[in-house]
């Protein structure tokens, strides 16, 4: 399969960089590589990912089909018999595929009629939803919260299944397995092990946008047509037999969490994901009587509805909301029923957490073996993996959890027998020990945060006699947290008559998550405390995500990371994929689709008052520098039309700057810098405390620009406006980045991260002692700088969002003039970067925007 000759079936005329992207992507997948792709926003990255990967997939399926036909049994038979056998096999496969496509085509026509007539199956839907309400109202019996008898102390065996299916009844599990791989379904659909693409991104809105792009593309079928002579037309050159041509729309399913996909109103209203998960599992437990189970869950009675759900999902490309509506129409839980679709899909879209967390993959019966993984918006992938496997618990939560356990133990004292009584007492003892340690930390005034030795948490009386491995299994198998929370919730609602939703995480679930991390520590995990007023937060933090991602990488055929700003890429090579053999990892950085004349990028090391801009932590409080900053921004705003967005390194520094700008410049009654800025452009700024939400702030900003006044928006790197917000065209003619948002290197957490990187680098390095230490120190410094520069690059990427866009990007700090920092900027920025004095920079801005304005006027004429 030669990617250089491919058209990739792009719905438009692709840019050269898109063609390069698609070819490199195709090659990476074909050669089973790990690829990192950087392509700026506005360059059509999503369509490049779709066209490159699905072109490869259809080619691969076509090759498998042809190989399967050629490798027919009976090679010792006469050639005419072999030819007949191959032709017959082609006919059977083609007819099977045609039956599928015809059925899905009928569904598409039905859906079109449904939309036109606006007909919905409201009575059926209401009946199903009302059934769900009635069944849920029967869950308040005290007996539902009693612990099952527990005696699974054998460490070698356990009844616990790591998958969430462990709580389902045997009939439900059997049905799910049947629906995902029955002979009848496999006769018509792709087999379970057919290669597919798993595409994930940060949010469901991004996945919905991806689905919209997916609808634009049409690919040739995976089964090639035959010529009139009965030969397979692999080149597309012969006269085709019309009966052998197939239409094969892309098969897609979008997956989500229970919180996203649940259609049971009384479960959905719980609000919190953990509470929804636990209530859902409660209603599917094998111990629940049939009449009390969730009516939307798969069962023998609604098997036909599940098949109907599957066909409707596969008939067209749907986003997660569409799939929820299909579930409501068919009366089937989309979360569970989607499993019957995964095996028959070509591309599966899902949010980060469902792909990156093994327990989530197990819950959905997702196997990554020999499939293709594409992770979009992957610039923060290492942080995302670390956050998924990190957990916090506060002293307040521990106290509440201990109180709830005490109430529960008293209520069920007579019924708690044997191992249940022993283990509940052990959990209470462990919580008490951890709480006691945190109380001592709170009482000590000298430190606000620091590292925690795990042994300090286990210093309570009798803790050394607890077998943490057994207790960990007990917490998972007994469902203690669920039982206790259910009882507490039931008691509270009965007394206070307050059945409204609660969006907070149930305390004992949070406590249990922390305890499980504590009992099963990763070699890459560390414990920290952080004081917050009269409370203390205890944090289990994963320092290195490599091991948690490695299993997925080694299972998959190929792994693709893509993003608009993946630079600097050295962290992926040196840390996330450090175990890969040379040549197994490939990196690609593509330029922008805009001409270089549409970008003015300048480092600004001095202001118009000739103050050096040095926004390091030690020097950024200089009043003179902050005043010069304001005056310089004012001059830049005069030269820049429409919207200007300025990013500060932190909320604290932004607030400090604004306070100084509010003060009069002298005693002569001159206006403040803030007033002066307001005369040039209306001024808005992001604040943690401000009541105005992000949408309202952006709308106000856009309104000023639409009115022709322009606007200056002060925001924060790493804040709400620095990621996922498009400041295209007039919204972002100027982007100013002020300083470098380095994390607090003195914090215990960052000290631990850097020490970990240095130690791993030292262990991997060769050479003498001094050389190894030098490499380790350099690696730690790089890791620290790269974390900062990823945030900077995200801010820079907010502007210039399409081919005809243009903007000026100015980076205020002397460090932006150094080769080391510039090397960590995206390539398309580096190519346009010019250093000049501030006077020349401002003069260039006037010229730059005057030229752009004259071009726009000419176009309008």
UniProtKB/Swiss-Prot annotation:
Binds 1 [4Fe-4S] cluster. Belongs to the DEAD box helicase family. DEAH subfamily. DDX11/CHL1 sub-subfamily. Its cofactor is [4Fe-4S] cluster. Its EC number is 5.6.2.3. Transmembrane segments: none annotated. Its main location: nucleus. A motif (DEAH box) lies at residues 376-379. This is ATP-dependent DNA helicase CHL1. It is found in: Nucleus. One of its GO terms (molecular function) is ATP hydrolysis activity. Disulfide bonds: none annotated. Residues 4-428 form the Helicase ATP-binding domain. SMART domains: DEXDc2, HELICc2. ATP binds at residues 39-46. [4Fe-4S] cluster binds at residues 262, 280, 294, 333.
């Amino acid at each position: 399969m030669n990617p250089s000759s491919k058209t990739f079936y792009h719905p438009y005329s692709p840019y050269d960089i898109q063609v390069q992207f698609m070819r490199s992507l195709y090659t990476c997948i074909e050669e089973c590589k790990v690829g990192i792709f950087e392509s700026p926003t506005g360059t059509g990255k999503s369509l490049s990912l779709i066209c490159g990967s699905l072109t490869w997939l259809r080619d691969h399926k076509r090759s498998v089909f042809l190989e399967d036909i050629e490798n027919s049994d009976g090679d010792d038979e006469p050639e005419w018999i072999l030819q007949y056998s191959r032709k017959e096999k082609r006919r059977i496969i083609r007819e099977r595929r045609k039956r599928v496509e015809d059925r899905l085509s009928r569904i598409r026509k039905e859906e079109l009629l449904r939309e036109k007539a606006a007909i919905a199956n409201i009575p059926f839907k209401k009946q199903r939803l009302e059934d769900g309400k009635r069944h849920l109202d029967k869950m308040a019996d005290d007996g539902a919260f009693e612990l099952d008898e527990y005696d699974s102390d054998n460490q070698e065996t356990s009844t616990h299944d790591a998958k969430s299916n462990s709580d389902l009844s045997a009939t439900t599990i059997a049905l799910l397995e049947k629906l995902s791989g029955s002979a009848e379904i496999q006769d018509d659909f792709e087999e379970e092990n057919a290669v597919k693409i798993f595409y994930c991104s940060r949010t469901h809105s991004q996945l919905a946008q991806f689905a919209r792009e997916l609808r634009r593309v049409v690919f040739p079928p995976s089964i090639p047509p035959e010529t009139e002579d009965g030969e397979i037309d692999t080149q597309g050159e012969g006269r085709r037999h019309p009966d052998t041509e197939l239409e094969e729309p892309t098969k897609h399913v979008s997956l989500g969490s229970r919180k996203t996909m649940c259609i049971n109103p009384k479960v959905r209203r719980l609000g919190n994901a953990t509470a929804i998960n636990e209530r859902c599992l409660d209603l599917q437990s094998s111990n629940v009587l049939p009449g009390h189970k969730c009516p939307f869950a798969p069962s023998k009675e609604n098997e036909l509805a599940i098949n109907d759900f599957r066909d409707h999902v596969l008939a067209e490309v749907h986003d997660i909301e569409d799939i929820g509506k299909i579930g409501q129409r068919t009366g089937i839980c989309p979360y569970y029923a989607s499993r019957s679709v995964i095996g028959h899909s070509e591309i599966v879209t899902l949010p980060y957490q469902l792909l990156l967390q093994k327990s989530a993959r197990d819950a959905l019966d997702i196997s990554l073996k020999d499939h293709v993984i594409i992770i979009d918006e992957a610039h923060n992938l290492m942080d995302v993996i670390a956050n998924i496997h990190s957990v916090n618990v506060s002293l307040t939560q521990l106290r509440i959890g201990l109180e709830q356990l005490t109430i529960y133990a008293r209520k069920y004292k007579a019924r708690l027998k044997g191992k249940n009584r022993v283990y509940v007492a052990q959990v209470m003892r462990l919580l008490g020990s951890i709480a006691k340690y945190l109380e001592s930390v709170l009482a000590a005034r000298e430190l606000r945060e620091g590292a925690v030795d795990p042994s300090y948490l286990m210093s309570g009386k009798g803790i050394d006699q607890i077998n943490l491995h057994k207790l960990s299994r007990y917490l998972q198998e007994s469902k203690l947290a669920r039982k206790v929370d259910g009882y507490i919730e039931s008691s509270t609602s009965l007394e206070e008559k307050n059945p409204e939703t609660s969006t907070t995480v149930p305390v004992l679930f949070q406590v249990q998550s922390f305890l499980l991390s504590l009992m099963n520590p990763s070699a890459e995990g560390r414990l920290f405390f952080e004081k917050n007023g009269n409370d203390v937060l205890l944090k289990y933090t994963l320092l290195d995500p490599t091991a948690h991602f490695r299993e997925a990488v080694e299972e998959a055929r190929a792994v693709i990371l893509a993003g608009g700003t993946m630079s600097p890429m050295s962290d992926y090579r040196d840390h996330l994929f450090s175990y890969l053999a040379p040549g197994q990892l490939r990196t690609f950085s593509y330029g922008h689709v805009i001409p270089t004349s549409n970008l003015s990028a300048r480092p600004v090391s001095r202001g118009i008052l000739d103050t050096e801009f040095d926004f390091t932590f030690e020097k950024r409080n200089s009043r003179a520098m902050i005043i010069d900053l304001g005056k310089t921004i004012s001059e830049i705003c005069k030269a820049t039309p429409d919207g200007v967005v300025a990013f500060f390194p932190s909320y604290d520094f932004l607030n400090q700057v604004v306070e100084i700008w509010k003060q009069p410049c002298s005693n002569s009654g001159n206006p403040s810098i803030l007033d002066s800025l307001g005369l040039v452009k209306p001024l808005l700024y992001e604040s943690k405390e401000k009541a105005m939400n992000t949408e309202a702030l952006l709308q106000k900003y856009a309104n000023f620009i639409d009115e022709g006044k322009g606007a200056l928006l002060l925001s924060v790197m790493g804040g709400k406006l620095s990621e996922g917000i498009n400041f295209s065209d007039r919204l972002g003619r100027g982007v100013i980045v002020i300083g470098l948002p380095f994390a607090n290197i003195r914090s215990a957490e960052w000290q631990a991260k850097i020490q970990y990187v240095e130690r791993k680098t030292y262990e991997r390095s060769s050479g003498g002692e001094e050389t190894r230490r030098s490499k380790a120190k350099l690696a730690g410094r790089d890791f620290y700088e790269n974390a900062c520069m990823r945030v900077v690059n995200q801010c820079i990427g907010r502007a210039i969002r399409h081919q005809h866009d243009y903007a000026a990007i100015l980076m205020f700090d002397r460090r932006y003039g150094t080769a080391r920092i510039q090397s960590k900027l995206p390539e398309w920025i580096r190519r346009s970067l010019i250093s000049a004095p501030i006077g020349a920079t401002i003069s260039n801005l006037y010229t730059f925007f005057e030229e752009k304005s004259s071009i726009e006027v000419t176009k309008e004429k």
